[in-house]
Curated annotation (Swiss-Prot):
Protein name: Acireductone dioxygenase
Assembly, per entry: Monomer.
Stated family: Belongs to the acireductone dioxygenase (ARD) family.
Cofactor note: Binds 1 Fe(2+) cation per monomer.
Known role: Catalyzes 2 different reactions between oxygen and the acireductone 1,2-dihydroxy-3-keto-5-methylthiopentene (DHK-MTPene) depending upon the metal bound in the active site. Fe-containing acireductone dioxygenase (Fe-ARD) produces formate and 2-keto-4-methylthiobutyrate (KMTB), the alpha-ketoacid precursor of methionine in the methionine recycle pathway. Ni-containing acireductone dioxygenase (Ni-ARD) produces methylthiopropionate, carbon monoxide and formate, and does not lie on the methionine recycle pathway.
Gene transcribed to yield this protein: mtnD
Transmembrane segments: none
Top-level enzyme category: oxidoreductase
Keywords assigned by UniProt, alphabetized: Amino-acid biosynthesis, Dioxygenase, Iron, Metal-binding, Methionine biosynthesis, Nickel, Oxidoreductase
HAMAP family according to UniProt: Salvage_MtnD
One MF annotation (Gene Ontology) recorded for this entry: nickel cation binding
Ranges in a coiled coil: none
Signal peptide: none
Binding site for Fe(2+): 100, 102, 106, 145
Length: 176
């Protein structure tokens, strides 16, 4: 289950499922929690995946992917894996942490590990959505954000795209 840290004066932490869901809905961010128990144990917490294993992950969650894709018009998906074994991980993370937006939704489903989306709220205040296995998030178009890893520095996620080309980041001049 995701948690949210709001970067206001109080550094408000939202931890209950109801609080998280209500806050994200108010921000226009889609949040779902999929049944991660469907994932075969041999793929849980595995970060060096073969193409066949990535395809298997997509097959395991095919119904959920098809459901959200039909509702939102998504056309393609892939699986990415990041860990300390990933070549140039620090360079990749530095690039991911550049604040940007897209002209379409940025959708991720966390399979293993953890990730953080830092998102600019409607009031201009940033908040971190700390994602765990089973969490799906869809950041709406034109919302400033960035993605990074949590302290464990590893994640396997399904990325779902509006186009077959994937997202095109539009970087901002101002830093977050």
């Amino acid at each position: 289950m995701a948690t949210i840290l709001i970067h206001n004066e109080e550094n408000t932490l939202l931890e209950s499922e109801q609080e998280v869901a209500a806050y994200l809905e108010n921000q226009g961010v889609i949040y779902e929690h999929w049944d991660i128990a469907k994932l075969p144990n041999r793929l849980s917490e595995k970060y060096d995946l073969t193409d066949e294993e990535k395809d298997e992950i997509l097959t395991v969650f095919q119904k959920e992917i098809e459901s959200i894709s039909e509702k939102r018009g998504y056309k393609s998906q892939d699986v990415i894996s990041l860990s300390d074994a990933t070549p140039n991980l620090d360079d990749l993370l530095q690039n991911f942490q550049r604040e940007h937006h897209h002209t379409d939704d940025e959708v991720r489903f966390i399979v293993s590990g953890h990730g953080i989306f830092a998102i600019q709220g409607k009031d201009g205040v940033f908040f971190d959505v700390r994602l765990n296995p089973g969490d799906l998030i869809s950041v709406p178009p034109h919302i400033r954000h960035y993605f990074t890893l949590q302290e464990d520095r590893k994640v396997v996620s399904v990325r779902i795209f509006v186009t077959t080309e994937g997202w095109v980041p539009i970087y901002e001049e101002e830093t977050v």
